[in-house]
UniProtKB/Swiss-Prot annotation:
A motif (Tryptophan repeat motif) lies at residues 981-997. It comes from Human immunodeficiency virus type 1 group M subtype C (isolate 92BR025) (HIV-1). The record marks G219, P220 as: Cis/trans isomerization of proline peptide bond. The gene is gag-pol. Mg(2+) 3 binds at D1207, D1259, E1295. This is Gag-Pol polyprotein. Residues 275-361 are annotated as: Dimerization/Multimerization of capsid protein p24. Binds 2 magnesium ions for reverse transcriptase polymerase activity. Binds 2 magnesium ions for ribonuclease H (RNase H) activity. Substrate-binding is a precondition for magnesium binding. A motif (Nuclear localization signal) lies at residues 26-32. Residues 810-818 are annotated as: RT 'primer grip'. GO terms for cellular component: host cell; host cell nucleus; host cell plasma membrane; host multivesicular body; membrane; viral nucleocapsid; virion membrane. Residues 187-225 are annotated as: Interaction with human PPIA/CYPA and NUP153. One of its GO terms (molecular function) is aspartic-type endopeptidase activity.
Length: 1431
């Protein structure tokens, strides 16, 4: 204790002992806490001397802080003690531990802010905003986004389909990008238009919000000063690239790129939530799920979380363990908080589920009954063996039970002076009998240090160097290797050896440590030795430095001579010879495969097969079994998949097929390694070319051993003569969904080293087809091809000579390749009198294939023939248009057309032509009349479109195709005037992409047939249109009202809401002049017409298009649905004049009947009968009884839920006692016979029996101050308060309600004979038929809500300590970064209240993640306090 007493002295020690352990506590810090802290520091391998200075304390806290979240109570207590000691050293005045922690946190925040400001100042000095870079002249220059980046982005979207990984990938790829670059990235996404529309909406919202928060300054911009960017400037629509660069590099800068990027990320977050709504909190390990798979899913989702790195680290430390299954969680917690991910995965390997429990049980059993002894003799068929005595050599008993005299010396080594239990020598164990070492340890020989790392092969192969270099053979084998005999293991590897000049036959045994020979005379001295052998121990003579010659190779080492049943060459000699075990069938690593979670393998019965098919399948399977591709299995495998056979095309041979459809449904999904096939137009011209084919491709790759059982199939016997023969696959089966992906992945890994060693060789790989090109001379090229074939053969992949193409033309992937040109393989279109659906499908497929090099191919009319549900064998008559189209295609295909190869030094040019009937054709070339490839486009992505939109879609398709094939986009030549294009594109900048392009005058030119105005047309008539339909009876109405008093309503049958909205617009266009303004509330109709279609699949939309073309000018606008929102009086008139009013007629009658009975206010009727507010107010206004003094206004008084005000009022000479619940305005009232204390007390007790009454507030009337009332209040536990005499405001609520009650009584008095009846009717109307005030509730609904809320509040307050155990991570405002952890103060249905540092915030529930903090049960200094309480 004295050793650390010098940490504090004098005044500092006094200050230390004045500080309390926790706020409001009695205990103070003492000297013993310093001693405890110094000892704890030694436990954590920290120098206790650091406690003597404030700098040392700061270093300790820096070390401890990362572990606080998951640390023990002792660790947190140590941190709190050091923090308090730091404040004492720094002379910071604190009263307790919590205050010390707050002071340190405040100091750290200030330090962090200074660091960030310094970094920001450094960044401001130079432009960090790549791709904006500074050139030699000091100017800021923009480098356009590269084709490689665009290609990577397109692949990400296509492969991931807006899964969470898309956001970090976008963030990484768009680092420092300008808005123009970001738009280029977005617009390369050709598909996913729904997602792009969502993104566009988000950007528009953010741009509008920017404009609202950054209003334009009045007056002109000063000379030399940049204008401030608007929302559309940031989005890149109304700003130039130079303006964007200037804003980004100005002083001070406006980072328009980063702002726009933030908007896009907000939109991408919405899209990701829609496409894959997975939170990190939802990632939990299944009971049988391997820990590795769980970790993969966890980190995949964690990468997509928008949170700081500190938060992600916390999630990894806490959630990864917290959400593991119980088996893994037990192991992980035992590892402790500092375990690395590698340690976790190693510890949890193979853990989980029944299999794990079975292994644990088996392990326990094996320790009890160790039967892991392998016998060498071939007649031993199991672990059972005959026991033999080591003492006398007889069988049937053990040495410890032997009655014979005990042999002298040790039974293990034969030496005297010790027993076997004390023997230190290790046995030879060359027969792998685990007599001395139950765990199976093998003896290490002296030559074991020279052992080579053997590659895994399935045959014994001897490698070596020079025959004469004996020492090098044993010590240094790094030289060039020579091939020696390969010995298969189908039989025992016996070889002839020469030892001591004598020839012997010996067994090469890689499991034996030593070389043991039968009785043979050897030169030199020997020493006795005892080794473990068959049937016990045998005595041998040990000769050192003996020369042995095996297969022409020589080795020197130790040889044991004794009564061995077979000569053994052990590893001490084999390693010197360089002998290795090799596996030529399949050295490829297997890819682990599993079934989908919760699914079992297929159990489909075998179909009936004919005799010839059974014989054919039997022969095929026998051959496959001999080759090791399949293995026979027994009845223990419960799975089955049907198998059948078909004859090969143009052959008498049979082909085996397995119907893996059921297994494919149950197998987990694979990512396709390649998105499509390589295209010859992307090939660079090469001097020498070869095309290879991998033989039996799938059968060269092994299948995961654990998955093989699911591929089981059965070959039945004829007439069920015998049980069916059962097999399972050892290799990738044909027809299984995983085979293509695993094969492609395996082939890529195999080719990787060859590609790295031969960068001058280009290899295009698709499935089993290989294109190999180089600029080498033909001789050198063919030598490299042989190297490649040998490389593939080493891995078990053969390349048959019959498919080895050495001379052009090369047939590859359906193409025909020549040295300087390419084409598709010859296409013959069939001549038929009648065409089936299947024939036309094949015909369209051939024409589509030909269209990539033959320009002008069309298939639209042929495809129309296939519309509708038709059987494949149905006869389809060709229409006149289809026959014409087919004849044109035949003409095109008559002349062979060739494409050229790609030259990287030249630009790509794409030219598009319109063919009519929504069909387009295009050519991509680098030199005129030398096409790289051609194609067509004929899709209608929407039901309503126009030529400009179709042209932009074709441009997108070509650009995407170009990025995939060449990695860059071409320059476009388009048949459209620049003015026409820009007029349409202005409103669709986000949906389409504008590449570099130029006008080409190739008729027919594309044009817009009409254009909508941007602003209302002055002087033109305005039509307010609307439509509505009943879904059940399909009846509807459409109509309009104009600002000039005209109106029209038509009834429509068999219609929908959307059709009536369009019908209303059609009526307005039909009845209007050449110029018209139209206002609609339908986003559907607005979206169709604003896209300016000139053709549609809808007849009604075509009629609207015809009307629009006839008009000179049209303005179309949208307002929210016709409910008076935004003060649109004209739309309200439309509602009340016909269209909407028709829909409310039934409700109006019911509301009027209700009002005549109860005189409900307008809010109650609007809510109950779904009336527009204007209609409900009109009903109240037309009631003479409700217009005496206008409608009473109600307010909310901020009072406790248990407070009531009581008062007596008089009407018709009678006394009415009224009680009002202050918080809700709810009334209880009764006519009482007399204003006495007895009657009042009785009323109070009835009130207390119905509602929770805590306080009653009355005036000083004689009945209220009577002893009877006081006694009733005392008994019921009610506190009574009195108002101020002669001041009616102190009873304001009940006084107001008295007037309201009398007014309602006046409205219903004629409906009741007695006053007491009218009073109860008025109470009912007030409590349940009048809505208003906070929440728009009635008083009855409000009091129930307030009481229920009060109960919930009290229950939640009881759990406040539990709530404080939770931590909250939240997003603030529009910032996508997660903040936290913060302290949870309150959790409601819609929002939570949290405390972050000293700030208390209310955050919507959808923007928070609430997580239990398992690391510490008590916060702050409590841990320290509890620790000290134990002392």
């Amino acid at each position: 204790m004295g050793a650390r007493a010098s940490i504090l002295r004098g005044g500092k020690l006094d200050a230390w002992e004045r500080i309390k352990l926790k706020p409001g506590g009695k205990k103070h810090y003492m000297m013993k806490h310093l001693v405890w802290a110094s000892r704890e520091l030694e436990r954590f391998a920290l120098d206790p001397g650091l406690l003597e200075t404030s700098e040392g304390c700061k270093q300790i806290m820096k070390q401890l802080q990362p572990a606080l979240q998951t640390g023990t109570k002792e660790l947190i207590s140590l941190h709190n003690t050091v923090a308090t000691l730091y404040c004492v050293h720094e002379k910071i005045d604190v009263r307790d531990t919590k205050e010390a922690l707050d002071k340190i946190k405040e100091e750290q925040n200030k330090s962090q802010q200074k660091t960030q400001q310094a970094e920001a100042a450094d960044k401001g000095k130079v432009s960090q905003n790549y791709p904006i870079v500074q050139n030699l002249q000091g100017q800021m220059v923009h480098q356009p986004i590269s084709a490689r980046t665009l290609n990577a982005w397109v692949k990400v979207v296509e492969e991931k389909a807006f899964s969470p990984e898309v956001i970090p990938m976008f963030t990484a790829l768009s680092e420092g990008a300008t808005p123009q670059d970001l738009n280029t990235m977005l617009n390369t996404v050709g598909g996913h238009q729904a997602a792009m529309q969502m993104l566009k909406d988000t950007i528009n919202e953010e741009a509008a919000e920017w404009d609202r928060l950054h209003p334009v300054h009045a007056g002109p911009v000063a000379p030399g000063q940049m204008r401030e960017p608007r929302g559309s400037d940031i989005a890149g629509t109304t700003s130039t690239l130079q303006e964007q660069i200037t804003w980004m590099t100005n002083n001070p800068p406006v980072p328009v790129g980063d702002i726009y990027k933030r908007w896009i990320i907000l939109g991408l977050n919405k899209i990701v939530r829609m496409y894959s709504p997975v939170s990190i909190l939802d990632i939990k390990q299944g009971p049988k799920e391997p820990f590795r798979d769980y970790v993969d899913r966890f980190f995949k989702t964690l990468r997509a979380e928008q949170a700081t790195q500190d938060v992600k680290n916390w999630m990894t430390d806490t959630l990864l363990v917290q959400n593991a299954n119980p088996d893994c969680k037990t192991i992980l917690r035992a590892l402790g908080p500092g375990a690395s991910l590698e340690e976790m995965m190693t510890a949890c390997q193979g853990v989980g589920g029944p299999g794990h429990k079975a292994r644990v049980l088996a392990e326990a059993m094996s320790k009890v009954n160790n039967t892991n002894i392998m016998m060498q003799r071939s007649n031993c068929k199991g672990p059972k063996r005959t026991i033999k005595c080591f003492n006398c050599g007889k069988e049937g008993h053990l040495a410890r039970n032997c009655r014979a005299p005990r042999k002298k010396g040790c039974w293990k080594c034969g030496k005297e002076g010790h027993q076997v239990k004390d023997c230190t020598e290790r046995q030879a164990n060359f027969f792998r009998e685990n007599l001395a070492f139950p765990q199976g340890e093998a003896r290490k020989s002296s030559s074991e240090q020279n052992r080579a790392n053997s590659p895994t092969r399935r045959e014994l192969q001897v490698w070596g160097r020079d025959n004469n270099s004996l020492s090098e053979a044993g010590d240094d084998r790094q030289g060039t290797a020579l091939n020696f005999p390969q010995i298969t293991l189908w039989q025992r590897p016996l070889v002839n050896i020469k030892v001591g000049g004598q020839l012997k036959e010996a067994l090469l045994d890689t499991g034996a440590d030593d070389t043991v020979l039968e009785e043979i005379k050897l030169p030199g001295n020997w020493k006795p030795k005892m080794i473990g052998g068959i049937g016990g121990f045998i005595k041998v003579r040990q000769y050192d430095q003996i020369l042995i010659e095996i297969c022409g190779k020589k080795a020197i080492g130790t040889v044991l001579v004794g009564p061995t049943p077979v000569n053994i060459i052990g590893r001490n000699m084999l390693t010197q010879l360089g002998c290795t075990l090799n596996f030529p069938i399949s050295p490829i690593e297997t890819v682990p495969v599993k079934l989908k979670p919760g699914m079992d393998g297929p159990k489909v019965k075998q179909w009936l097969l004919t005799e010839e098919k059974i014989k054919a399948l039997t022969a095929i399977c026998d051959e496959m079994e001999r080759e090791g591709k399949i293995t026979k299995i027994g009845p223990e495998n419960p799975y089955n998949t049907p198998v059948f056979a078909i004859k090969k095309k143009d052959s008498t041979k049979w082909r085996k097929l397995v119907d893996f459809r059921e297994l494919n449904k149950r197998t987990w999904d694979f990512w396709e390694v390649q998105l499509g096939i390589p295209h010859p137009a992307g090939l660079k011209k090469k001097k020498s070319v070869t095309v290879l084919d991998v033989g039996d491709a799938y059968f060269s790759v092994p299948l995961d051993e654990g998955f093989r059982k699911y591929t089981a199939f059965t070959i039945p016997s004829i007439n069920n003569e015998t049980p069916g023969i059962r097999y399972q696959y050892n290799v990738l089966p044909q027809g299984w969904k995983g085979s293509p992906s695993i094969f492609q992945s395996s082939t890529t890994k195999i080719l990787e080293p060859f590609r790295a060693q031969n960068p001058e060789i280009i290899i295009y790989q698709y499935m089993d087809d290989l294109y190999v090109g180089s600029d080498l001379e033909i001789g050198q090229h063919r030598a490299k091809i042989e190297e490649l074939r040998e490389h593939l053969l080493k891995w078990g992949f053969t390349t048959p000579d019959k498919k080895h193409q050495k001379e052009p033309p090369f047939l590859w992937m359906g193409y025909e390749l020549h040295p300087d040109k390419w084409t598709v393989q010859p296409i013959q279109l069939p001549e038929k009198d009648s065409w089936t659906v299947n024939d036309i499908q094949k015909l369209v497929g051939k024409l589509n294939w030909a269209s990539q090099i033959y320009p002008g191919i069309k298939v639209r009319q042929l495809c129309k023939l296939l519309r509708g549900a038709k059987a494949l064998t149905d006869i389809v008559p060709l229409t006149e248009e289809a026959e014409l189209e087919l004849a044109e295609n035949r003409e095109i295909l008559k002349e062979p057309v060739h494409g050229v190869y790609y030259d990287p030094s030249k630009d790509l040019i794409a030219e598009i032509q319109k063919q009519g009937q929504n069909q387009w054709t295009y050519q991509i070339y680098q030199e005129p009349f030398k096409n790289l490839k051609t194609g067509k486009y004929a899709k209608m992505r929407t039901a309503h479109t126009n030529d400009v939109r179709q042209l932009t879609e074709a441009v997108q398709k070509i650009a995407l195709e170009s990025i995939i094939i060449w990695g860059k986009t071409p320059k476009f030549r388009l048949p459209i005037q620049k003015e026409t294009w820009e007029a349409w594109w202005t409103d669709y900048w986000q949906a389409t992409w504008i590449p570099e392009w130029e006008f080409v005058n190739t008729p027919p030119l594309v044009k817009l047939w009409y254009q909508l105005e941007k602003e209302p047309i002055a002087g033109a008539e305005t039509f307010y249109v609307d439509g509505a339909a009943n879904r059940e009876i399909k009846m509807g109405k459409a109509g309009y009202v104009t600002d000039r008093g005209r109106q029209k309503i038509v009834s429509i049958t068999e219609t929908t809401n959307q059709k009536t909205e369009l019908q209303a617009i059609q009526l307005a266009l039909q009845d209007s002049g050449s110029e018209v303004n139209i206002v609609t509330d339908s986003q559907y109709a607005l979206g169709i017409i604003q896209a300016q279609p000139d053709k549609s699949e809808s007849e009604l939309v075509n009629q609207i298009i015809e009307q629009l073309i006839k008009k000179e000018r049209v303005y179309l606008s949208w307002v929210p649905a016709h409910k008076g929102i935004g003060g649109n009086e004209q739309v309200d008139k439309l509602v009340s004049s016909g269209i909407r009013k028709v829909l409310f007629l039934d409700g109006i009658n019911k509301a009027q009947e209700e009002h005549e009975k109860y005189h409900s206010n307008w809010r109650a009727m609007a809510s109950e009968f779904n009336l527009p507010p204007i209609v409900a107010k009109e009903i109240v206004a037309s009631c003479d009884k409700c217009q005496l003094k206008g409608e009473a206004t109600h307010g909310q008084v901020d009072c406790s839920p248990g407070i009531w005000q009581l008062d007596c009022t008089h009407l018709e000479g009678k006394i009415i006692l009224v009680a009002v619940h202050v918080a809700s305005g709810y009334i209880e009232a009764e006519v009482i016979p007399a204003e006495t204390g007895q009657e009042t007390a009785y009323f109070i007790l009835k009130l207390a029996g119905r509602w929770p009454v805590k306080v009653i507030h009355t005036d000083n009337g004689s009945n209220f101050i009577s002893n009877t009332v006081k006694a009733a209040c005392w008994w019921a536990g009610i506190q009574q308060e009195f108002g101020i005499p002669y001041n009616p405001q102190s009873q304001g609520v009940v006084e107001s309600m008295n007037k309201e009650l009398k007014k309602i009584i006046g409205q219903v008095r004629d409906q009741a004979e007695h006053l007491k009846t009218a009073v109860q009717m008025a109470v009912f109307i007030h409590n349940f038929k009048r809505k208003g005030g906070i929440g728009g509730y009635s008083a009855g609904e409000r009091i129930i809500d307030i009481i229920a809320t009060d109960i919930q509040t009290k229950e939640l307050q009881k759990q406040i300590m539990k709530i404080q155990n939770f931590r909250v991570y939240y997003r603030d405002s529009r910032d996508p970064i997660w903040k936290g952890p913060a302290k949870l103060l309150w959790k409601g249905e819609g929002a939570v209240v949290l405390q972050d540092n000293s700030d208390i915030k209310v955050v919507p529930r959808r923007k928070v993640k609430i997580i239990k903090d398992y690391g510490k049960q008590m916060a702050g200094a409590d841990c320290m306090a509890s620790r000290q309480d134990e002392d």
